[in-house]
Structures are given as C-alpha cells and as structure tokens.
Amino acid sequence: MPLSGTPAPNKKRKSSKLIMELTGGGQESSGLNLGKKISVPRDVMLEELSLLTNRGSKMFKLRQMRVEKFIYENHPDVFSDSSMDHFQKFLPTVGGQLGTAGQGFSYSKSNGRGGSQAGGSGSAGQYGSDQQHHLGSGSGAGGTGGPAGQAGRGGAAGTAGVGETGSGDQAGGEGKHITVFKTYISPWERAMGVDPQQKMELGIDLLAYGAKAELPKYKSFNRTAMPYGGYEKASKRMTFQMPKFDLGPLLSEPLVLYNQNLSNRPSFNRTPIPWLSSGEPVDYNVDIGIPLDGETEEL
C-alpha cells in the first residue's frame, strides 16, 4: 500500500558539526580569541615604512628627515617652548585634557548618565564655528536637542561653547565626546606673526600685504615692428648719398668661337659612323634590296 504524501528528504549533517560534537570542542571554540583582524591598511603601510628593509622605506625616511630639516631651518620658533605655535601642546593624549588659553584638546568618556567634557577657557565667538563634536555609537537617536550645555530627551547632547560643559544622556551605554579645535596656522601666516586667536577675526590678503615698489620702466622688445628710436626718427628721410665717380667707356668684348667650321662637327646618329678627321666627304653604300618572302598557301 503506497504511503500518503511524499516522505521528507534525508538531510545530511555537516561534517564540521559532527567533528565538533565528537571532539567536544564546540562550546570551547566559540570563545577562542584569534587576535585582532587587520582592517586598516594604513597601519600596515606605516609599519612597513618603519622597518627600513627596502628601498621605499629608506626613501621615505630620508624624505622625513629633509622635511624636519626644512621646518627647523625656516621656522625655528616652532621648536621653542615659549612659542605660541609649539606643536607639542596640540597633540592629543589618551584620556586626558590638554591645552591652555583657549587652545587645546579635551577628551572624556561618559558611562550612562552625567558624562562631561571640559575645554580651555575662551569665548564661544572665537571658536564657535570651528568646534566639532563627535558622538559615540552608544548615543540615542531621534530626540529633540536642547540648548547649549543641556541634553536632549532621548538623544544626544546639545552643542556647547568653548570652555563650557556638554552633558550626554544615553539609554545605557558608553559614549565618547571629543572636542577638537582648529589651531593650524599656515607658514605664511606664522611668518607674518598671526595669533591663533585672531585667525577667525582677520582676513589677510597675501597679495595686498606690504608696500608695492614702483616697477622700472624697461624697454619693450615685443614682436611689434617698431624701429629703433621710435617713429619720429624713422619718418625722416635718409641723409646718406652715394659718392660720385667717373665711369669709363663701355667696350664690347669680342666673341670667341671655338670650332668655327660647323661642317667638321661629329655626328652622333645611331649609325656607327667613325669620327671625321677632315672635311672630305665619305660615301657609304647601303644595300637596301632586301628580298621579301611572300605568303604561301600553307600559311
């Protein structure tokens, strides 16, 4: 008697699951730490450049040394501790606060509720547009933002000014608040003595900086056809006159005819005639009675 319906197919179990069950390492292998997966090629590139084992890394190191030498020779004030542009105070540290007089870097973590960050003392008008806030992945989304320094309901914190405190309110989780100040000054501005606090207030035009000296009036040698001395001197007539000298009587030169006897000229016809050494006539008898063979009946 046939069975009603089609039977279920016999599914084969995977060999990997069978091996894990037989060895008993299914639960232990799930907690195995295989290390950090390299996802950023920049770290690998910098590590290869620091090995100094190939030609490219050596060239990169020499280029770094040339750049440092150029900066040290042209801008020695950067390496002094008393300078405002000392770049070491702008380098961030892990979990700390760095910066003086309205400049620097602030970093903080907040667990759950009540995280805060602190920047340098300053006014919000100077660095308000350059301030950037980066929120971590644990911050909530969809809330309405409040004023500066206060947290939105169910969302991220509002934007705080420089020197103020911003608090985050997350629904259970960690969030990082990083405030980065743009304190980069170009070498042109540094050479002109521009203060970082005046960077946002001043608009410097490098072309209009300094007094312009009067250009010397050089003579133009363009392709325009201009005579030397200008058109005024060129319009005058030529004052040079040819000197007068007496011309002698014109004498006709006698015509020299070589081989005046034209009859003695050799003939270059196709008939092989020898050279004529004298004017005596030479007769040639040519038999032109060539018999003509007529056509026969066979042809």
Swiss-Prot record:
InterPro entries: MYOZ. Residues 1-34, 102-174 are annotated as: Disordered. Its main location: nucleus. The modification Phosphoserine is found at residue 82. It comes from the Eukaryota. Residues 112-125, 137-173 have a biased composition (Gly residues). One of its GO terms (cellular component) is actin cytoskeleton. One of its GO terms (molecular function) is molecular condensate scaffold activity. One of its GO terms (biological process) is negative regulation of calcineurin-NFAT signaling cascade. Myozenins may serve as intracellular binding proteins involved in linking Z-disk proteins such as alpha-actinin, gamma-filamin, TCAP/telethonin, LDB3/ZASP and localizing calcineurin signaling to the sarcomere. Plays an important role in the modulation of calcineurin signaling. May play a role in myofibrillogenesis. Interacts with ACTN2, ACTN3, FLNA, FLNB, FLNC, LDB3, PPP3CA and TCAP. Interacts via its C-terminal region with MYOT. This is Myozenin-1. It comes from Homo sapiens. The gene is MYOZ1.
